[in-house]
Amino acid sequence: MQEIMYLAPELVLVATGLVILLTGVFLSPQSKNILGYLATLGTLAAIFLTVKSFGLLTMEGFSVQYTIFSETLSIDALSQFFKLVFLAVALIVSIASIKYTENSDHTEEFYTLVLFATFGMMIVASANDLILLFCAFELASLATFALAGFEKQNARSLEGAMKYFVIGSVSAALMLFGLSFVYGATGTTSIPLIAQNPGLLTGNPIGIVAIVLLTAGFGFKMALVPFHMWAPDTYQGSPSVVSALLAAGSKKMGFVAAFRVFIIALAALQPDWQFMFTLLAVVTMTFGNVVAVAQTSVKRMLAYSSLAQAGYIAMAFAVMTPVALAGGIMYTLAHAFMKAGAFIAAAAVVWMITSEKTGNLDIPDHLDSFRGLGKRMPLAALCMTVFVFALAGIPPTAGFMAKFVLFSSTIQAGMTWLAVIAILNSALSLFYYARLVKYMYFMPPEGKTEKVSIPFPYAAALLVAVAGVLVMGLWPEPFVELAMKAAMVLVPF
């Protein structure tokens, strides 16, 4: 019974998803909005239970860790922190989707997939066994594959979903192949037991092969270059609320899995994978920012921006000090609020363009669609401004504080050159973020000019995301402390 209680947040999500799926069958499309509110309530309940368990873990000290179900699941500060990241994204997406799924015939399927995807991500965060880790990865991936192609009549959406599915399937095969090499060398799939037998991997060519395969497998989900090929098309083609879930939530699943597998299980091979992540971090952040400059689709620009942000988080693997790991972990939460909010703001603009049937209907998220947004939809423009400035690292936002912790710890570790590259990339990103702000506030609107009321679900989701960005920026101490406790699971202080 005690083990079940530790999984209460996950069970709440599954129960909510099943209730939504069964209830939706008996509701008319016009009555299905209630399902969005039910999904929101279920997510809020899961957040409450996760926060409560996080408090119990940290009350007794920094090193408290519980393992359940024959030590296949670990309940610790790292798992609970990432569960909060996933649930925060699910909350924002669930609220915004109340408008997106309005009058849809498939509302119940949509919310069930969102909640089941979040459930899979949360299991990945706690996975203490390679087999369970892979199964949870696939559960979340299958749900997001379906969500990416949710608009079956949209050719761009189907193209992005197909690329996501094909490349995702290949990456899953590579990941499973890498995990099998680790099992073959160590004789176990338990992450703690693998860590306790470092001699079985060091000096063994199988260990190097496993690192390469696992980097490719996890790199796909983290959208690290050159494993990013799916991301721009999928983020642009998917419904904006789904893009928010993928960029802000699903990507973090790859990071928490990599934290456990590389830093804990494969600690003996640190010199090898540390070099790989250093190279990937530099290439990813630079490529993402440079290509984002040339984009005219805002969602595609945000996709390449997500590559750059992944490069910043990957710096934690390159530096490998406790503070740098805490900075990378904190950045995942900051990025969740910033990126989810930015995609929801884009969703509001896409709704405005498609409902008015004006502008570029083929690419409704084109930069021209954002012309004069400050006058036409002031709240969406203001929130988008907060998000892009936070992504650029402008104070007093979550992005600034997370970058400050991560970059300063990189300098303290003696890797000043890496910090300089990251700072220059942040400066470059300010160009395309500022260009978007210019379009919203300093360029006249195309077509209609009258003010548009933003739908309540979009407004509520935006305000939740803005609150997260500003609270983390203005009051960072508790978030830094929680991130430090999570980092202690990986590297003892």
From Swiss-Prot:
The chain crosses the membrane at residues 7-27, 34-54, 78-98, 107-127, 130-150, 165-185, 205-225, 244-264, 273-293, 310-330, 333-353, 381-401, 404-424, 454-474. It holds the Pfam family Proton_antipo_M. GO terms for molecular function: Methanosarcina-phenazine hydrogenase activity; NADH dehydrogenase (ubiquinone) activity; reduced coenzyme F420 dehydrogenase activity. Optimum temperature is 39 degrees Celsius. One of its GO terms (cellular component) is plasma membrane. One of its GO terms (biological process) is methanogenesis. It is a multi-pass membrane protein. It is found in: Cell membrane. Keywords: Cell membrane, Electron transport, Membrane, Methanogenesis, Methanol utilization, Oxidoreductase, Transmembrane, Transmembrane helix, Transport. It catalyses: methanophenazine + reduced coenzyme F420-(gamma-L-Glu)(n) = dihydromethanophenazine + oxidized coenzyme F420-(gamma-L-Glu)(n) + H(+). Optimum pH is 8.5. InterPro entries: NADH-Q_OxRdtase_suN/2, ND/Mrp_TM. Its EC number is 1.5.98.3. Belongs to the complex I subunit 2 family. The FPO complex is composed of at least 13 different subunits. FpoA, FpoH, FpoJ, FpoK, FpoL, FpoM and FpoN proteins constitute the membrane sector of the complex. Component of the F(420)H(2) dehydrogenase (FPO complex) which is part of the energy-conserving F(420)H(2):heterodisulfide oxidoreductase system. The membrane-bound electron transfer system of the complex plays an important role in the metabolism of methylotrophic methanogens when the organisms grow on methanol or methylamines. Catalyzes the oxidation of methanophenazine to dihydromethanophenazine. It shuttles electrons from F(420)H(2), via FAD and iron-sulfur (Fe-S) centers, to methanophenazine (an electron carrier in the membrane). This is F(420)H(2) dehydrogenase subunit N. The gene is fpoN.
